[in-house]
Amino acid sequence: IVLLMVVTSNADRICTGITSSNSPHVVKTATQGEVNVTGVIPLTTTPTKSHFANLKGTQTRGKLCPNCLNCTDLDVALGRPKCMGTIPSAKVSILHEAKPVTSGCFPIMHDRTKIRQLPNLLRGYENIRLSTSDVINAETAPGGPYTVGTSGSCPNITNGEGFFETMAWAIPKNKTAMNPLTVEVPYICTKGEDQITVWGFHSDNETQMVILYGDSKPQKFTSSANGVTTHYVSQIGGFPNQTEDEGLKQSGRIVVDYIVQKPGKTGTIVYQRGVLLPQKVWCASGRSKVIKGSLPLIGEADCLHEKYGGLNKSKPYYTGEHAKAIGNCPIWVKTPLKLANGTKYRPPAKLLKERGFFGAIAG
């Protein structure tokens, strides 16, 4: 801790000290223990919990898409049809969803992959945009030709059947089993950004698997990018009818994952029947600091603190709960600090001939 000093004369030097008693004029020094002084200035405050706010002078992001009503951040990240919009740039992002949140669309097996981490991954970037073109032509991909499937459980903006914008449900026109095939995922971002490519696969009960794909056996899938390879085998059947958006209930499930492609790097996906091929990709650049918090963001604050919310800095130090903080924040200390702004106190009955340095404290 940097010690703050006030020079009161050539002979007296008073330094920051910790409070020793209820008296505001007693400080504990490193060399002379408890010392009475003629005046002190408090240097610490104990904050009270408040709402979170926008960080002063900094673009602060709450929801990924503020204008996407009734949408979770995962809805936005996957491109749910009713949750398409612009993600504003931000230097600071609030991790506001306290627990893993599902997507209100086709039932997803969230625990099979890291897909719930996707919104947090996007929050960590300053600039995020969805590509205007598809990364793969799903209809003519290996193993096709395919029809791009839609679902009543994932309605579009006109309440017709839809599907996620980031993926194409590849339903083969020829209902036959297929050995694993490979498709390359090119890099299509145009500004040197990281490319986040979403993909997945669908599985259902044996009857539906035969109807949709001509094969009722478990299917194998693999993704690879930047030296990271992930393998999956689909689960056949055993799912209760379910919907995540009060739409048409589904007996099937989808597993969704993503790969991160660095500029110019190609990814690969090895798949069998039921693949959800990548379509629009996220192009992301810059860094955004992420802090746990809550919405709405009200007003502005000097500092965002995970335990106290938005803080305005009134003192250089604070006591209380120690946690991550972003911005112009006070420094956490265990014990309240005060700055002596007077001289060493001398009782009137006792004359002191020598006036000298009486120590700095341990911070």
Curated annotation (Swiss-Prot):
Record localization: Virion membrane; Host apical cell membrane
Gene Ontology terms describing biological process: fusion of virus membrane with host endosome membrane; fusion of virus membrane with host plasma membrane; symbiont entry into host cell; virion attachment to host cell
Keywords (A to Z) from UniProt: Disulfide bond, Fusion of virus membrane with host endosomal membrane, Fusion of virus membrane with host membrane, Glycoprotein, Hemagglutinin, Host cell membrane, Host membrane, Host-virus interaction, Lipoprotein, Membrane, Palmitate, Signal, Transmembrane, Viral attachment to host cell, Viral envelope protein, Viral penetration into host cytoplasm, Virion, Virus entry into host cell
PTM per Swiss-Prot/TrEMBL: In natural infection, inactive HA is matured into HA1 and HA2 outside the cell by one or more trypsin-like, arginine-specific endoprotease secreted by the bronchial epithelial cells. One identified protease that may be involved in this process is secreted in lungs by club cells. Palmitoylated.
Glycosylation positions in this chain: 36, 70, 156, 174, 205, 241, 312, 341
UniProt keyword Transferase present: no
Gene3D superfamilies per record: 3.90.209.20, Hemagglutinin Chain A, Domain 2
UniProt key word Disulfide bond: yes
Domain of life: Viruses
Signal sequence range: 1-11
InterPro entries: Capsid_hemagglutn (IPR008980), Hemagglutn_HA1_a/b_dom_sf (IPR013828), Hemagglutn_influenz_A/B (IPR001364)
Molecular-function annotations in GO: host cell surface receptor binding
Chief location category: virion
One protein family per Pfam: Hemagglutinin
Gene Ontology CC terms: host cell plasma membrane; membrane; viral envelope; virion membrane
Further details from the record: Major glycoprotein, comprises over 80% of the envelope proteins present in virus particle.
Subunit text: Homotrimer of disulfide-linked HA1-HA2.
Name of the protein this chain belongs to: Hemagglutinin
Organism, as annotated: Influenza B virus (strain B/GL/1954)
